[in-house]
């Protein structure tokens, strides 16, 4: 019995994503009982992170590896999103003040308890939204694992959705200046299916201002931007074409 237990823990430790975490619900499906997992913790092989979640004792926890572990073991529809997804796609490097944040989009209202831990290399920040009728995802290969993330087109729109509370519009335009290779068909799909008028109008305004070739391939006549005025800031500049009041700094930037 002891030999079997050691063989199972060796197999488990060999297959865990470096820096990742383990979910008891996934382990049970692989034949690991609650009693066996308790024995692994008692023996010091595994350490509890939160209820039903463990990691290999002594590991430095990676937020990305943990998210990949969750996607793989539980099937949760979490994905790397917003500026974090843009970083993974190589489009943008966000320089944080203090500990970096990993933005995660979820279809569940609550942040899982394990994601609130301070043990990760990044602060994991969850958000939920029903603004996008079409979710464009991509699988991004990391060192020893693959993680699901928003497409670059969706990721930038997620940034716009979270502005101005999470992001500054001027900073987002600096990102737009790097998005030289967005795919117009993907952009078209997202703009036609999102129900958020601010996202539609600000994306179109910024894309037109940047004057990329891909913008010229978008059929704006198929995109409903609504009729009501939107004020994004006080003391800004009103853009009549898109019926939005934007920061003066952005309007005057060339």
Locations of the language-model features?
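Exposed, interaction-prone assembly regions rather than primary DNA-binding/catalytic cores
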Residues: 82, 86-139
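Long, compositionally biased
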Residues: 67-72, 119, 207-211
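Short beta-edge/loop segments at beta->alpha junctions of small alpha/beta modules
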Residues: 1-83, 180-195, 199
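Residue-level signal for well-ordered alpha-helical scaffold segments within enzymatic catalytic domains
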Residues: 39, 84-88, 155-159
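Positively charged, aromatic-accented nucleic-acid-binding surfaces
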Residues: 69-100, 226, 230-240, 249-254
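Hydrophobic alpha-helical interaction segments
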Residues: 30, 136-254
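Short linear loop/turn motifs
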Residues: 42-44, 55, 99-105, 222-223
């Amino acid at each position: 019995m002891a030999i079997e237990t050691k063989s199972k823990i060796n197999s488990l430790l060999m297959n865990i994503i470096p820096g990742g975490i383990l979910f008891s619900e996934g382990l049970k499906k692989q034949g690991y009982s609650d009693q066996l997992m308790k024995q692994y913790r008692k023996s010091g092989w595994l350490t509890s992170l939160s209820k039903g979640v463990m990691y290999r004792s002594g590991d430095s926890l990676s937020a990305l590896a943990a998210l990949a572990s969750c996607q793989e073991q539980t099937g949760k529809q979490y994905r790397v999103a917003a500026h974090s997804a843009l970083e993974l796609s190589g489009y943008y490097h966000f320089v944080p003040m203090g500990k970096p944040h990993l933005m995660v989009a979820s279809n569940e209202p609550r942040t899982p308890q394990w994601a609130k831990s301070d043990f990760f290399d990044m602060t994991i920040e969850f958000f939920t939204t029903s603004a996008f009728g079409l979710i464009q995802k991509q699988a991004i290969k990391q060192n020893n694992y693959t993680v699901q993330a928003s497409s670059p087109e969706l990721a930038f729109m997620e940034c716009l959705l979270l502005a101005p509370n999470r992001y500054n519009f001027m900073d987002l335009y600096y990102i737009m200046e790097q998005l030289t290779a967005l795919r117009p068909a993907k952009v078209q799909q997202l703009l036609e299916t999102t129900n958020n008028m601010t996202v539609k109008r600000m994306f179109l305004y910024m894309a037109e201002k940047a004057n990329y070739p891909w913008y010229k391939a978008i059929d704006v006549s198929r995109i409903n931007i609504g009729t009501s005025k939107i004020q994004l800031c006080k003391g800004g500049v009103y853009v009549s074409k898109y019926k939005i009041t934007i920061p003066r700094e952005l309007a005057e930037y060339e």
